[in-house]
A protein has these predicted regions:
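Gram-positive cell-envelope targeting signals
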Residues: 1-60
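A surface/extracellular/periplasmic glyco- and lipid-processing/surface-interacting theme
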Residues: 3-8, 46-51, 55, 78-120, ...
Length: 396
């Protein structure tokens, strides 16, 4: 039997179903209107927020490379040059360009005391002929020294020293043969024992004359005047700043391995003539005080002790030349002694040539370091006795 689908017939059951459907449509429509009203009348657009597709990324830390710092080269600064006085080692403002002045100093007992020798950078003592002993004072700048002397005549050995240091030699005349010898050596010098009406470069000490000094012991040089007079005479007073004077200095020249030498005694001895000099160390002064003729020397103008930072004794081959005047072999050199700060060592010395410079060395050949300050230099014949401290050591 075949079944047959038939549409439901109208009746009560069918009407109820239709009513339910109609009500559902109305409800849905009402809800839709309410939603429209909420969104804005007449505006059917709906703002839809789409889900964000962005995502949080952890902050990226880039590897930071420190900027490459090129090594900076500081501009090279040349050290400021240090200029020193060639005869005393003291610091000066600029290159040394002055010519040294040397003055012949009377050293006979009757002529004492000296005047102005404490202001010399170097004071030398030596036999000059037979038994006559004199001094030679060297000044890098004599202009501040009001009086120097007393002044006596020049000698051959003074001309030798003048050539070693290229000095302007100041003297009170001299033997004709000695003056001729100086000229042959190329020494520039002049005699201050001449008519100087205005006392520009020299004067006679009237007080000495009244005190009974001999006329030959009363002549003095004026430091500023001798430079002025040299200029007036056309004598060169400047110097090559690169000139080598041969001397080396340090702030403390006390010999490290030296023997104690609270006093140093030298007996100048040549051809039967003798003269004693003793240098006595004064710890308070830090200098050796000059003693001769049984007494300590003082400056006749200031009353200050005549004292020196350095004591140098040069034992030289000596000979007679030109009527008994002495000459030393500076180029051959020899041995000697150096005392400073209360100690003493043996040394060697020689000049490079007759034009210098004069050099001092230790026994092992190192340059001798003098203490900054003034120096006493004795030039004595080989064989002149030297003793120090208790006299237990002697050089013959």
């Amino acid at each position: 039997m075949h079944g047959k689908y038939e549409a439901p017939k109208s009746g009560k059951g069918g009407g109820a179903a239709i009513l339910i459907i109609a009500l559902a449509v109305l409800v849905v429509a009402g809800l839709g209107f309410a939603a429209w009203k909420l969104l804005g009348a007449g505006d059917r657009r709906v703002s839809v927020t789409e889900p964000s597709t962005e995502f949080t990324t952890a902050p990226t830390t880039e590897a930071t490379t420190e900027p490459t710092t090129e090594p900076t080269t500081e501009p090279t600064t040349e050290p400021e040059p240090v200029y020193t006085n060639p005869l005393n080692g003291e610091i000066i403002d600029g290159p040394f360009t002055k010519r040294i002045f040397s003055v012949s100093i009377n050293n006979l007992q009757d002529s004492l005391p000296h005047v102005g020798t404490n202001s010399a950078d170097i004071y030398m003592e030596m036999f000059v002929n037979y038994s006559i002993i004199r001094g030679l004072a060297l000044y890098t700048d004599p202009t501040d020294v009001p009086a120097i002397g007393s002044v006596r005549s020049t000698r051959v050995i003074f001309s030798q020293i003048s050539r070693l240091f290229d000095t302007v030699m100041i003297h009170a005349g001299g033997n004709g043969s000695v003056l001729a010898n100086a000229k042959e050596r190329g020494v520039e010098s002049y005699n201050i024992d001449t008519w100087d009406a205005n006392n520009i470069y020299s004067f006679r000490d009237k007080d000495r004359s009244r005190q009974g000094y001999g006329w030959e012991h009363t002549l003095f040089a004026r430091g500023d005047g001798i430079v002025e007079e040299a200029v007036n005479r056309g004598i060169r007073v400047d110097q090559d700043p690169d000139k080598d004077y041969g001397l080396c200095f340090t702030e403390d020249g006390t010999p490290e391995n030296g023997e104690a030498a609270t006093s140093v005694s030298l007996t100048f001895s040549f051809n039967g003539s003798k003269k004693d000099t003793t240098m006595v160390y004064d710890e308070a002064l830090g200098k050796y005080v000059y003693n001769q003729y049984g007494k300590s020397m003082v400056d006749g103008a200031t009353g200050e002790p005549e004292a020196f930072k350095n004591v140098v004794i040069l034992l030289a081959d000596m000979e007679f030349v030109i009527h008994g005047y002495h000459q030393a072999d500076f180029v051959a050199g020899g041995e000697g002694y150096f005392a400073c700060g209360g100690k003493l060592i043996p040394i060697r010395w020689k000049a490079d040539s007759e034009e210098g410079p004069l050099r001092f060395t230790t026994l092992d050949g190192e340059p001798l370091l003098l203490n900054v300050g003034n120096s006493y230099i004795a030039i004595a014949a080989v064989g002149s006795p030297v003793t120090w401290d208790t006299g237990s050591s002697e050089a013959e």
